[in-house]
Amino acid sequence: MALNIPFRNAYYRFASSYSFLFFISWSLWWSLYAIWLKGHLGLTGTELGTLYSVNQFTSILFMMFYGIVQDKLGLKKPLIWCMSFILVLTGPFMIYVYEPLLQSNFSVGLILGALFFGLGYLAGCGLLDSFTEKMARNFHFEYGTARAWGSFGYAIGAFFAGIFFSISPHINFWLVSLFGAVFMMINMRFKDKDHQCIAADAGGVKKEDFIAVFKDRNFWVFVIFIVGTWSFYNIFDQQLFPVFYAGLFESHDVGTRLYGYLNSFQVVLEALCMAIIPFFVNRVGPKNALLIGVVIMALRILSCALFVNPWIISLVKLLHAIEVPLCVISVFKYSVANFDKRLSSTIFLIGFQIASSLGIVLLSTPTGILFDHAGYQTVFFAISGIVCLMLLFGIFFLSKKREQIVMETPVPSAI
């Protein structure tokens, strides 16, 4: 299948703008979040693990709400409006509320941060992804070609994040609010009341439809697979790898700056892969594509246990550019092929996002404790071993079903 980027489709442009602005906002602080907490605020590995656990646990509550409500709303925007306000308020919150509280009253800062980040980012990311995926199915373009702009946004944010962070993290936080304001303006332009296809996903969704998903054995196989792979990968990539990489250099500041550059380049590659991989997944099937993504995941984690050369680790980091698009696109296509496509937000947010978050909640603190006592190498060996075991589980138990690809009527290019 030929690569088709539908720039003339106005709905594609809206979906791309949503993704670009959200992810550039997120990357400006999230890509260096662990370094900020540990290097600037002085949190221990145990405190860092506890903070990540509480953040993820709180986001689970919002994910459950977001998934069910957005499936009922179709493509209506109340929840997207909520996200836009969180983006705008991020700068003042981080500077005047979160940072002082973590230093003076860790428990209160922990709780307020978990509520804020869960509502706007950790659950909001899945909400926005599922919202743009609904747009893609309703308005006839591949989700990955729009999501690629989110990766480009993340790359741009990550590139400048390291530069501004080395001057003052507060610059990063204020820029998030600036891009949040632009996100809000884009949301104003997308007039959901004018679209004829808005209710297509939501039509006839009943309580029984949601219950049927949770009774499906295949759903729970999928959840177990996600917990055993994506949860551990997020712990590795978010909590451990940034500090590990920065520590490979003589100066922590130099390592932080180079990590920002590397992260930016990696996400540019990720964006290119995000646009191409949907067509690869259509060819090989979502199960096979998902398993390939997990093989890359295991190799990347294991390589960090075996090598400490910054050049080798930098090359290993770039594997993320293939792995993440493979996993995310495959999850959406696996969900549509195996479950009720009207419930795509519920499946993605509960089956993928909540499942991985539960794993992070349960595993972040033990991983932090293991790191404090044994160091990076032992933790990386342990995580890669578990991911390999779950790869075998997926080979035997994940479904091989595929969605039937149907040619759709083109959508008009203007609103």
Swiss-Prot record:
Spell out the Gene3D superfamilies in the cross-references.
MFS general substrate transporter like domains (1.20.1250.20)
Q: How does it sit in the membrane?
A: Multi-pass membrane protein
Keywords, in A-Z order: Cell inner membrane, Cell membrane, Membrane, Sugar transport, Symport, Transmembrane, Transmembrane helix, Transport
Family matches, as PANTHER family: 3-PHENYLPROPIONIC ACID TRANSPORTER-RELATED (PTHR23522:SF10), BLL5896 PROTEIN (PTHR23522)
Annotated GO MF terms = lactose binding; lactose:proton symporter activity
| Listed name of the protein | Sucrose permease
Please give the family membership noted in the entry: Belongs to the major facilitator superfamily. Oligosaccharide:H(+) symporter (OHS) (TC 2.A.1.5) family.
One GO term under biological process is:
sucrose metabolic process
Q: In which pathway does it act?
A: Glycan biosynthesis; sucrose metabolism
